[in-house]
Amino acid sequence: MMKSTDIIRYRLHNQQIAGTKLRNPLEIVERLGAVQAQDYSGGLWGIRLRLPGSKLVDIEKALINRKIIRTWPMRGTLHFVPARDARWMLELLTPRVIRRSAGRYKELGLNVDE
């Protein structure tokens, strides 16, 4: 059985919080797949936490240069994702979000097909 300290160490490593070898915001977001960014500054912090010595401008530069974009591929929640992955993520996940929102659409008098 694993010790709780080992579990904590593995989680920190796998989440790129400790011991990362990644060098820039894009590599972090690619490795994680997405970073939750419903709160913009919280999303920036989530990336910066994983890049010791990085500056906010480094992350914002990746956004300005469209290496990373902020979109809502999962659960209707905003995330930072690699720009080159956004299309397939949205194509894969949007139908599920729409299905799960059907009740709310009906309440609002919206038609999914419109």
Model-derived features: positions:
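Phosphate-backbone binding and catalysis cores of DNA-processing enzymes
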Residues: 1-114
